[in-house]
């Protein structure tokens, strides 16, 4: 979400605590996160950036379904790192730059990166998320209106 003051909203939550219901809640939460990333990317791209690739790190990279979701919901290619500990590798890149081993962070990244597996967005699948994204934006607008009442 490209609004640092936004709060989370869950719509349609029921008292059903069955396994299937919890799976649906988990999936819709993941979709919400992916749409939040899409919102941030759109804000950046509207302000002069041209982001079309996401380099992801962390535990969620172990879930191919989430990586597919991020690609399809954002329309960006997703690069999953080959490094086992990509976050630590990134920290090492910053440290190597600070220690003067590289002239800048970009040079450290180019020299130390270990590549990754690139997953392309599926445009046909992405259009399924357009409706969800319109709902996402409308819920954000409504949440802002509620905040103004306070």
What does each model-identified segment do?
Residues 89-98:
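Short, small-residue alpha-helix embedded
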Residues 1-89:
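Activation-segment/catalytic-loop signature of the eukaryotic protein kinase fold
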Residues 23, 99-150:
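Acidic, glycine/GT-rich loop-and beta-edge segments that sit at the periphery of enzyme/chaperone cores
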């Amino acid at each position: 979400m490209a609004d640092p003051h936004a709060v989370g909203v869950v719509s349609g939550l029921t008292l059903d605590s069955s396994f299937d219901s919890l799976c649906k809640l988990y999936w819709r939460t993941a979709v919400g996160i992916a749409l939040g990333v899409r919102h941030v990317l759109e804000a950046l791209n509207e302000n002069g950036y041209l982001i079309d690739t996401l380099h992801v790190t962390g535990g969620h990279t172990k879930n191919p379904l989430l990586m597919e979701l991020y690609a399809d919901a954002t329309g960006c290619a997703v690069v999953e790192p080959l490094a086992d500990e990509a976050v630590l590798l990134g920290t090492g890149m910053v440290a190597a730059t600070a220690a003067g081993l590289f002239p800048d962070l970009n040079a450290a990244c180019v020299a130390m990166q270990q590549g990754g597996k690139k997953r392309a967005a599926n445009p046909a699948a992405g259009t399924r998320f357009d409706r969800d994204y319109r709902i996402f934006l409308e819920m954000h607008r409504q949440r802002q209106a509620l905040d103004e009442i306070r």
